[in-house]
């Protein structure tokens, strides 16, 4: 029975799939049955990533609809699918263009993935995707200085003081263990 839903959102090429690829085996090592839903706008090859690591997955292409609106309109079917797969945790990866579709995030652990190389001003441009996030993941941390990373972390804390912050290197997996541990313990009231 589905116990937890984790929403991973962020712009194109920020490393959402790389983060998931690193935390999936860590969550599975905690005896959690996982499934993944990938929602993209036009096309994606990320389904192959999940197929290669042998995890139940489904891909949705939103087309001319915002990926978040597409997600909300398909949530009942998605929960049913995850239940059929006997998943404890459903991981949803979305482009999250508007991320304003509450109640989608009310019963989910909502996460925002941000690329450190984008700019120290990027967090302010993410709007609700960042300000309503339960956790924020910084990627490409190896490509910026410690000082730049601290400035970005400070900007994020300024915009969302309650979000838990993680730095994850999508290539090496550095930092993924802390995120996986936190996600396995994090809980919200759920009524799927």
Regions found by a protein language model. Give the residues of each.
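Canonical P-loop GTPase G-domain recognition
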Residues: 142-192
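Nucleotide-state-sensitive switch-loop elements of NTP-binding domains
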Residues: 2-106, 119, 141
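Glycine-rich, phosphate-binding/catalytic loops in enzymes
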Residues: 25, 54, 107-110, 127-129, ...
């Amino acid at each position: 029975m589905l116990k937890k839903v984790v929403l991973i959102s962020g712009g194109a090429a920020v490393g959402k799939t790389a983060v998931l690829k690193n935390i999936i085996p860590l969550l599975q090592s905690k005896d959690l049955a996982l499934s993944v839903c990938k929602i993209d706008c036009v096309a994606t090859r990320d389904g192959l990533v999940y197929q290669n690591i042998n995890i139940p997955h489904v891909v949705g292409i939103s087309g001319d609809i915002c990926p978040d609106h597409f997600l909300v309109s398909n949530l009942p079917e998605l929960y049913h699918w995850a239940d059929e797969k006997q998943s404890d945790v459903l991981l949803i990866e979305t482009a999250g263009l508007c991320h304003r579709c509450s109640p989608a995030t009310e019963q989910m652990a909502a996460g925002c993935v941000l690329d450190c190389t984008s700019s120290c001003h990027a967090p302010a441009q993410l709007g609700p995707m960042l300000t309503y996030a339960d956790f924020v993941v910084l990627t490409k941390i190896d490509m910026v200085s410690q000082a730049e990373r601290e400035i970005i972390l400070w900007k994020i804390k300024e915009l969302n003081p309650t979000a838990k912050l993680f730095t994850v290197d999508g290539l090496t997996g550095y930092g993924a263990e802390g995120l996986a541990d936190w996600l396995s313990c994090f809980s919200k009231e759920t009524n799927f």
